[in-house]
Curated annotation (Swiss-Prot):
Identification of the protein by name: Somatostatin receptor type 3
Family designation: Belongs to the G-protein coupled receptor 1 family.
Phosphothreonine PTM positions: T348
InterPro entries: GPCR_Rhodpsn, GPCR_Rhodpsn_7TM, Somatstn_rcpt, Somatstn_rcpt_3
Compositional bias annotation for Acidic residues: 348-360
Annotated region (Disordered), positions in chain: 1-21, 335-418
Predominant subcellular localization, coarse grouping: membrane
Ranges facing Cytoplasmic side: 70-79, 139-161, 232-257, 317-418
Amino acid sequence: MDMLHPSSVSTTSEPENASSAWPPDATLGNVSAGPSPAGLAVSGVLIPLVYLVVCVVGLLGNSLVIYVVLRHTASPSVTNVYILNLALADELFMLGLPFLAAQNALSYWPFGSLMCRLVMAVDGINQFTSIFCLTVMSVDRYLAVVHPTRSARWRTAPVARTVSAAVWVASAVVVLPVVVFSGVPRGMSTCHMQWPEPAAAWRAGFIIYTAALGFFGPLLVICLCYLLIVVKVRSAGRRVWAPSCQRRRRSERRVTRMVVAVVALFVLCWMPFYVLNIVNVVCPLPEEPAFFGLYFLVVALPYANSCANPILYGFLSYRFKQGFRRVLLRPSRRVRSQEPTVGPPEKTEEEDEEEEDGEESREGGKGKEMNGRVSQITQPGTSGQERPPSRVASKEQQLLPQEASTGEKSSTMRISYL
């Protein structure tokens, strides 16, 4: 048994015919020497159904993210550029699920060796692109929080597009072994990777290779970035910042929280997969039907991660939430008429609250100033009683809207004889 994937149940007990290592579109070979009819029924009906549901949800969610970023963002930010590439990788990652569901339902690969190689290569490229994008996003968060001034000229949308293109190229280079060794070997009916002799050494080396470059290496960089961010935030926690700096820092913290949530979900969904495969290299896992559900869950989690990212964006980002509403509720005239009061999707809810608080504080300051002027006017022995300034009266009318219906003269008299 090699790199886990319950895409088909091998009926052979020969180790040489076991499916090969590729996450996650390799087959789970040798689950048992003779699978039960009940196990075949579950594999042929329930598993394809789960894959198709995940595929539909993932395609719809990531398509919505791509549309919102491209249509409802006038000038995409650096983070939005990376989110766009992450959503594109997740969407292409979902395209391999129908082939996987067909192999589960039919118990063999019906699409030929060329499609096997193409599907596995595209699947691998998008898998590595996802983790590489998360790594780049974490580095971007580090630069934005720890070195905001020095990194300003590098943290631009054109630079982010160049970095994203480099990420796709790097992913294509990393999966070259998949292009070379994947296919449908003679005498077998499943799509997997066929290694030269010694096959066990090649298989173990490839598992370590993919785990190091596709998970543990990037995870180390991500953890280092957020460790430095925490140190920076704690060291600057007691400083007094100007209002503009405070607003920018709050915005950076919101974006950082969203990126951390996406990274945490990725680790949660992919960690069991890689850990179980590394354990399988050291000590072969049990090949019993009782463990089939566990193996399926471990392999299904990475696909579920790709369809869960849009949900995270909707919950954690106000701009994406507003963009989703504009797209999904577009036919409603009522919602459309209320859109201008909500504001553009690039504006966060917290920023609206900050502006409202700022306006209230400014109005409060004006009110205090007005009260001081009114008290000076009403003091006995001053000449201000006979000629109160019109500017004071107009401001008092704004502060006292219930008196707006009276004339200007009466308002002035009320101010004079308070």
